[in-house]
């Protein structure tokens, strides 16, 4: 995510009042999402559908990813892990002519989640692609600046060093730099940033 921030930031041609306002708007949205309590409302069919639309827009906009947006919304595990696993197990059972899954409410719910997410993604691709392309073409600076602010503000939502109490309240903390675990985390953090930056440079060669 930090690597994506670096890449997208340098797409800003210049910093002026308009781009500053855009960064502020994006930063505010990102911070609100990062500090929002109980953002996960994954049981709602409508939310799952819109999650698909939002996730696919992350694939269209530079510097964002659908998985990252799902993580921020709190439904990454439900959609990308649980429902995908449910599909795999279901297909495996169908091949084995085992149809007992139709009596499993949890399995059927997860398959429904995957269908809703897929329909939402397709709808988002059709609905958002032209709009986002137009924004990037005609209002590139303000669009990019909002994305830059959003990425910066939402970084706290994926901060790896956090504690959660029995009530679900999350608090962030600064890691202990005397431990091997911290330096291992920082090493892979650096590798991830380097990988994204190198990919971007190779793409422009």
Q: Could you say what each language-model-derived stretch is?
A:
Residues 1-61, 65-205:
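Multi-pass membrane proteins that catalyze or facilitate reactions on polyprenyl-/lipid-phosphate substrates
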């Amino acid at each position: 995510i930090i690597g994506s921030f670096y890449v997208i930031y340098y797409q800003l041609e210049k910093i002026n009042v308009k781009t500053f306002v855009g960064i502020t708007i994006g930063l505010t949205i990102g911070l609100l999402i990062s500090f929002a309590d109980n953002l996960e409302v994954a049981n709602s069919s409508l939310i799952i559908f819109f999650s698909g639309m939002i996730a696919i827009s992350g694939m269209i906009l530079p510097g964002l990813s659908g998985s990252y947006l799902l993580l921020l919304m709190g439904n990454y595990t439900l959609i990308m892990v649980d429902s995908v696993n449910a599909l795999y197990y279901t297909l495996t059972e169908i091949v084995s002519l085992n149809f007992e899954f139709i009596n499993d409410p949890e399995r059927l719910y997860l398959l429904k989640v995957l269908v809703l997410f897929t329909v939402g993604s397709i709808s988002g691709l059709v609905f958002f692609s032209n709009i986002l392309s137009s924004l990037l073409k005609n209002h590139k600076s303000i669009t990019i600046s909002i994305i830059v602010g959003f990425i910066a503000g939402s970084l706290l939502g994926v901060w790896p060093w956090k504690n959660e109490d029995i009530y679900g309240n999350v608090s962030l903390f600064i890691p202990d730099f005397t431990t091997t675990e911290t330096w291992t985390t920082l090493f892979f953090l650096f590798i991830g940033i380097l990988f994204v930056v190198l990919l971007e440079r190779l793409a422009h060669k």
